[in-house]
């Protein structure tokens, strides 16, 4: 039997599958939600501290919502992240929402 390295951050947590736009799946990663949020906040000219505070709250809310699901689409994550971000900063939410159309 091979020894498996256990990641203490994910040990005991339910793995959630994300269905991407081209129908492949990957595991949910809260760091990606945080990173996307942070990028939008910084482009909306928020300070590092403001961006960190907002994105910490947003990523926790999104993760809490996702933990209730077995699988979600990336589009659902996009919508919930936009809604949560809009609660804190309309400009950052707009940038997050429209960046997807550009990329």
Annotate each predicted stretch with a short phrase:
Residues 1-103:
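Long, C-terminal-biased catalytic regions of enzyme "large/alpha" subunits
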